[in-house]
Amino acid sequence: MEMTSAFTLNVRLDNIAVITIDVPGEKMNTLKAEFASQVRAIIKQLRENKELRGVVFVSAKPDNFIAGADINMIGNCKTAQEAEALARQGQQLMAEIHALPIQVIAAIHGACLGGGLELALACHGRVCTDDPKTVLGLPEVQLGLLPGSGGTQRLPRLIGVSTALEMILTGKQLRAKQALKLGLVDDVVPHSILLEAAVELAKKERPSSRPLPVRERILAGPLGRALLFKMVGKKTEHKTQGNYPATERILEVVETGLAQGTSSGYDAEARAFGELAMTPQSQALRSIFFASTDVKKDPGSDAPPAPLNSVGILGGGLMGGGIAYVTACKAGIPVRIKDINPQGINHALKYSWDQLEGKVRRRHLKASERDKQLALISGTTDYRGFAHRDLIIEAVFENLELKQQMVAEVEQNCAAHTIFASNTSSLPIGDIAAHATRPEQVIGLHFFSPVEKMPLVEIIPHAGTSAQTIATTVKLAKKQGKTPIVVRDKAGFYVNRILAPYINEAIRMLTQGERVEHIDAALVKFGFPVGPIQLLDEVGIDTGTKIIPVLEAAYGERFSAPANVVSSILNDDRKGRKNGRGFYLYGQKGRKSKKQVDPAIYPLIGTQGQGRISAPQVAERCVMLMLNEAVRCVDEQVIRSVRDGDIGAVFGIGFPPFLGGPFRYIDSLGAGEVVAIMQRLATQYGSRFTPCERLVEMGARGESFWKTTATDLQ
């Protein structure tokens, strides 16, 4: 059976050829290797028709142009040579589009990313819509790759090398007005006239290339270029800690093209693409992509979700304000906040105002749209307006009696169908639901701070939670833009449970003489975004350590924190960044101020901070405890799969993405090697390092958590 073409050609009466992109059976247009023959057949027709005045590429999808290349193509490559050949095929196809003798225009609406932008760059002009859905970027670096179809060569010549490097090295996505300002697109128009605007541009004479800004022209010269690449290389190395080989190859390939010409640049690009595709870092990053995509498709349970027309929030503090923002402004669901104090309501409203006003200032949002979104949020000091709310999110203090009281009040003041979701980070959901008249509608919905930035939520049903309650809560989390994992109702749930021994070990090393900055730097070098001591300061030392006694009571001595250290720090009024002093000292300007280690911390905990062990040893001690606890969570079915475990660790605590998550990292080392390391550490430092039974058994049998493919489990 012949495959329906993803590219169709229609010649208008004005002799403009319109090529419509519509991948059959898919919501998103993605480029596949088999499309090359389709495009070449169309190019042949275009060349044969001497009456044509121009060509326009446009998408038939409602909200995307081309979202990128199909990543499965890379996974199907067994060697670097196969992946390189894939890149060369893409380069050749883009070159054939660019070589057409008539004006070729890309009419862009929605996501234009990766291979989609490379196709647009191969065109002679680009018009995009002013819709918020329209974004342009080259995100391949986030998969451990570089643009392989000419993007590293065309983009610097179009918008300048420094701007192009920023886009390619970070995967940054541009909105329409930003793209216009940088010269990436030639015009920005309403969606309703996109095709006609592109057609008019296609009819015009091909313009000479737009002159680059003076700064970019200086940086394109040999001296400026040498200085730029040295500075960018140094900055990139500091940011990546050498853990992401793609960034180094991007710099190398872009510089080759500028110094030696496009032919050498394309050759270097294809070679680098092939080699990067085979790196363990790219394989791990692609596994995270597939896993997160899979999680987003998971409904959480087999039951159909209930309607979600309105949400209530109890508590207008930092978490309540953040939850209100993502519910109203991301999910588009009306929110009513209840707080006993009018100041709490004002705080929550101001939180959303600050977020939206920032978008208006950056021209990412119109003032009218800001006002429309803010109108979805209202407040009250009692339960007026709560009677028909479909779901209530409780974000009050971590106190069991208070949360049980909230359940009782919601059941008294809200409808019989209303779901009660607690944002607890440590209290058992079963205990919160203990006195509920409708316990099947009580569930945990654990957000991470700051709510608007952290992508993960944990959804925690207790033994009596209904399947529909689970499905409805998962549905809400997805609408809020979150990646939800369903976890079992056990102490610490998943993320805090694997994080606690990691932080405990860092504090223990601190008491044994290691310096704060040495510990943090060691884990940043390993690949975490911040070190464990700094993380504790950011979360709040009082907040971050509150869960330790809960975990110790549930799981025993391996969760005990170093005696008296935490109490000594808290008794000295050290809460972390929020009160300006923790392990670090912070200036008076709040969150943007520069921090420095407070030397007074060492005598406070009874050490001189002289340090004795290497950075890799520091990282090993912290990370091995995290891995061991993650395996226990699988064994106890705290998480439903190692997929959820990897996603939870990467999205919830910043476990190094280039390692793929705790379980993929164990597989890369080998379970037997992890067991050997832990047994050595147990001999040196104590029984808390004893490897769990599941890990020992897997090591003995040579088993892995994941199969060889990026998406399947054993």
Swiss-Prot record:
Its EC number is 4.2.1.17, 5.1.2.3, 1.1.1.35. Induction: Unlike the aerobic pathway, the anaerobic pathway is not strongly repressed by FadR regulatory protein. It is found in: Cytoplasm. It holds the Pfam family 3HCDH_N. One of its GO terms (cellular component) is cytoplasm. It comes from the Bacteria. The keyword Oxidoreductase applies. Pathway: Lipid metabolism; fatty acid beta-oxidation. InterPro entries: 3-OHacyl-CoA_DH_CS, 3-OHacyl-CoA_DH_NAD-bd, 3HC_DH_C, 6-PGluconate_DH-like_C_sf, ClpP/crotonase-like_dom_sf, Enoyl-CoA_hydra/iso, FA_oxidation_alpha_subunit, FadJ. It catalyses: a (3S)-3-hydroxyacyl-CoA = a (2E)-enoyl-CoA + H2O; a 4-saturated-(3S)-3-hydroxyacyl-CoA = a (3E)-enoyl-CoA + H2O; a (3S)-3-hydroxyacyl-CoA + NAD(+) = a 3-oxoacyl-CoA + NADH + H(+); (3S)-3-hydroxybutanoyl-CoA = (3R)-3-hydroxybutanoyl-CoA. The keyword rRNA-binding does not apply. Residues 306-714 are annotated as: 3-hydroxyacyl-CoA dehydrogenase. Keywords: Cytoplasm, Fatty acid metabolism, Isomerase, Lipid degradation, Lipid metabolism, Lyase, Multifunctional enzyme, NAD, Oxidoreductase. The record marks 118, 140 as: Important for catalytic activity. Residues 1-190 are annotated as: Enoyl-CoA hydratase. One of its GO terms (molecular function) is enoyl-CoA hydratase activity. GO terms for biological process: fatty acid beta-oxidation. Catalyzes the formation of a hydroxyacyl-CoA by addition of water on enoyl-CoA. Also exhibits 3-hydroxyacyl-CoA epimerase and 3-hydroxyacyl-CoA dehydrogenase activities. Strongly involved in the anaerobic degradation of long and medium-chain fatty acids in the presence of nitrate and weakly involved in the aerobic degradation of long-chain fatty acids. PANTHER family: TRIFUNCTIONAL ENZYME SUBUNIT ALPHA, TRIFUNCTIONAL ENZYME SUBUNIT ALPHA, MITOCHONDRIAL. In the N-terminal section; belongs to the enoyl-CoA hydratase/isomerase family. In the central section; belongs to the 3-hydroxyacyl-CoA dehydrogenase family. HAMAP family: FadJ. Heterotetramer of two alpha chains (FadJ) and two beta chains (FadI). This is Fatty acid oxidation complex subunit alpha. It comes from Escherichia coli (strain K12). The gene is fadJ.
